[in-house]
């Protein structure tokens, strides 16, 4: 009996040792292959990052992957191997080779970490090009000019609520954050927060038929954090897919995963309730995004969206429509209150074009404000809502990306934050200069002064990608610009604004962004005085 027990223990020990040796050998083989035999081995980059995806994962968890990629391109050049199978390309030609029309690349496996229901994809995370085309054709009906104009009243309602908050009027929740104050004739607000409340209220009403009322009540403001946490979880899992496919997220990033699930359940409840209400309302239902999602069909197949697809599209619309707009508006005010000359130009343009605030609506008059558009573009350049590199996978046959051949299966992408700071495309790239977008305008940086040429504007446009480009570019771009134009113009028309403090500012004087796939931000704190 004793001998048998000893032999059994030795046998188990031997098996364990054997497995350990096998694991070490497999790991060593993986590292040696990545370093010396991988087809991407000749592309420069940090040695450790070429051995393991965990370096990139570390920066994803830390929230500074966009800054890390920027530093890598500064050190290694246009093409950088940032992970064993990921190449970051920081050129305008590379941008168009990767994301442009007719290219032999598709969304990477990264996006399989996003679906809330496995196998149910939306316009954002669908990898298959045919599937994406069907979904986009259905969704595009909600973004026609006619449809957007019909939704403008919802947006204007909430913009008016925001203006009332900034004017310090009664009737809104006065339990502000500790950093916010009300003084004689002025209020101080953290506009990173308040723009989030605005955009979530707008998109909540358009996507689910009911506002979250964040502008007037604290009740659902926690949803902003939940959405950010959900995006962060998707991002981290996409950077190392075993977290998702092996369910390791439930062990190593447990709280992120719980918060993501809380968001999923909240949005599922909202979508189910709205679908029932719409069915009861019939023809009387208001024509918002949910109306179009329920009723739109693919013009080629005649098919609409299933209930799970409907929920998925409403989810992604709410997130994408909120994050891009709130980040851009926060960035615009961040830089404007630090550049009094730019703020004065914008104020003069808006106040010279309109006599009453209610005249400021979408349309030709607003679209003719050249400096307003330039301010928004410059905010999008310096503070992109998705600052990292959105990954694409090279399809069969390989692809040449700005002169470098990448074999099938390679993941690659262009980091928005990095290319938007490339001196080759943006002179004095670290300076907020709306004039760079206006042909004939005078640009003044710390050590240079020049007149913007048509060639410079064209060069800047070619490298500009805040909404991505090509067939997978953001379908809601027109909606975002409409909301940003109207909101910023009304604020500039109604208020005198000034810098309150340095909250949200990084060491270089820019708006500090945290890369959670979408950008998280804090601030700016702005002083508002009603005119």
Name each region found by the language model.
Residues 414-454:
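Conserved cytochrome P450 K-helix/beta-meander segment immediately N-terminal to the heme-binding cysteine loop
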């Amino acid at each position: 009996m004793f001998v048998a027990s000893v032999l059994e223990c030795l046998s188990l020990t031997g098996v364990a040792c054997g497995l350990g040796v096998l694991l070490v050998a497999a790991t060593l083989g993986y590292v040696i292959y990545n370093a010396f035999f991988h087809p991407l081995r000749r592309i420069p980059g940090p040695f450790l990052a070429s051995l393991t995806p965990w370096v990139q994962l570390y920066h994803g968890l830390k929230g500074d992957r966009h800054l890390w990629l920027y530093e890598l391109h500064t050190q290694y050049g246009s093409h950088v191997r940032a992970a064993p199978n990921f190449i970051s390309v920081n050129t305008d030609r590379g941008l168009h080779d990767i994301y442009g029309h007719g290219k032999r690349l598709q969304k990477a496996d990264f996006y399989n970490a996003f679906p809330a229901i496995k196998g149910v994809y939306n316009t954002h995370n669908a990898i298959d090009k045919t599937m994406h085309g069907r979904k986009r054709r259905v969704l595009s009906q909600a973004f026609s000019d006619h449809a957007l104009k019909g939704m403008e009243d919802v947006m204007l309602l909430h913009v008016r609520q925001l203006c009332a908050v900034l004017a310090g009027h009664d009737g809104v929740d006065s339990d502000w954050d500790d950093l916010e104050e009300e003084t004689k004739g002025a209020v101080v607000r953290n506009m990173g927060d308040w723009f989030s409340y605005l955009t979530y209220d707008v998109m909540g009403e358009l996507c689910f038929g009911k506002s979250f009322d964040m502008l007037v009540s604290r009740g659902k403001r926690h949803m902003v954090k939940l959405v950010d946490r959900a995006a962060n979880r998707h991002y981290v899992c996409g950077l190392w897919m075993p977290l998702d496919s092996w369910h390791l997220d439930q062990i190593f990033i447990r709280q992120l995963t719980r918060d993501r699930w809380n968001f999923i359940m909240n949005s599922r409840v909202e979508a189910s309730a709205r679908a029932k209400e719409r069915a009861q309302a019939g023809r009387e239902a208001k024509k918002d995004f949910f109306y179009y999602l329920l009723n739109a069909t693919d013009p080629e197949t005649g098919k609409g969206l299933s209930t799970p697809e409907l929920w998925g599209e409403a989810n992604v619309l709410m997130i994408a429509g909120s994050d891009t707009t709130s980040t851009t508006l926060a960035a615009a005010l961040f830089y404007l209150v630090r550049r009094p000359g730019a703020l004065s130009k914008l104020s003069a343009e808006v106040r010279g074009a309109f006599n009453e605030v209610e005249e400021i609506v979408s349309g030709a008059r607003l679209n003719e404000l050249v400096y307003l558009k330039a301010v928004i573009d410059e905010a999008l350049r310096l503070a992109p809502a998705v600052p990292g590199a959105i990954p694409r996978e090279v399809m069969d046959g390989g692809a040449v990306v700005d002169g470098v051949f990448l074999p099938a299966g390679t993941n690659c992408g262009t980091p928005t934050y990095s290319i938007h700071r490339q001196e080759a495309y943006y002179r004095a790239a670290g300076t907020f200069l709306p004039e760079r977008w206006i042909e004939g305008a005078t640009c003044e940086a710390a050590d240079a002064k020049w007149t913007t040429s048509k060639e410079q504007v064209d060069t800047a446009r070619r490298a500009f990608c805040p909404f991505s480009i090509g067939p997978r570019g953001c379908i809601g771009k027109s909606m975002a610009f409409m909301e940003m134009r109207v909101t910023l113009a009304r604020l500039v028309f109604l208020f005198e604004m000034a810098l309150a403090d340095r909250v949200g500012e990084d060491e270089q004087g820019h708006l500090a962004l945290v890369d959670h796939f979408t950008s998280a931000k804090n601030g700016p704190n702005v002083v508002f005085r009603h005119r």
